[in-house]
UniProtKB/Swiss-Prot annotation:
UniProt note on tissues of expression: Expressed in germinating seeds.
Keywords: Chloroplast, Membrane, Plastid, Plastid outer membrane
Organism: Arabidopsis thaliana
Function: May play a role during plastid development.
Primary location group: plastid
The protein's name: Outer envelope protein 36, chloroplastic
Amino acid sequence: MFHGIKGCMIPMYWWLLGDLDLNGVRNSASSYSGGVNLSKLAVGLDLSEPASSKWSSTTSVKFEVPGHYLLQTLYMCVRLTMTDGRYQRSGRISYNMQNSLLCSGNTHDSMVVLKQESRFAKATDQGLSHFSMQIEQGIPVVSNWLIFNRFKFVASKGVRFGPAFPLASLTGGSIVGDMTPYQAFAIGGLGSVRGYGEVAVGSGRSCLVANTELANKMTEGTIFLDCGTDLGSSRLVPVSSLYLLRTRTIKKLLRHENDKAVAELVSGNPSLRQGKPGFGYGFGYGLRFKSPLGHLQVDYAMNAFNQKTLYFGITNLASST
């Protein structure tokens, strides 16, 4: 099977590193959000094994070349001030940059990915059970290609008690080896932790998200509680080599030796730089309506900071788990 060019808009965050003075890094950094255009060329083969009554399995191998374009602005201001009759130099570098998402520091990465996916699904009048496991292995055909192991699982269970239908779901995953920032597990938003924006809870090398719902067939309503965490792994999300090189260039321009301050800049951890908590929970209620398009979903959620969000969606209870 041939997989063509894919283009998508993914929610990411841009930030302004702020002012760097000659003695270190100031604490007044501002941030803003936007979109990053990420394109991926993928060529590969899929092999689907014969499915049993409840289990199915798919194995695939793909050559992938994700890439994007980096836009940046770099300028330096130097100011002379007089103190005790002598001029002293101070300055700042404003570095307005869309942080590179790629591991290589170039406009694209290259990787060969072997993927194994297994699914179990069972649905009866009394309830439903669902489990899926994905394992991806990056194969270093060439020395500078990415090598990693990434797995993700989703387990769901629902049991019917008269008109009530409680449903619980647990999602988790982790990645070891080479990693690009766009491979981080995103936590927050519809389908994850409701009450937060997309990726507003955090992004890390690992994640664990729990969702619980109690639906009532008579009222077509549901109450829910979501919680998610990056398991403290956001600090392990790397910064691109291009970003590292340019931050070192800033240090050279400023001619200071505050290695600790520079280390804080290049340590990665985009969640910390953007004030993401790394853990969050949300709760609320929703309504479900059947329509020719599917199940219409309306959820009203509040998070740990008492912020409220209204979600709309079209989903199917059996497939969304």
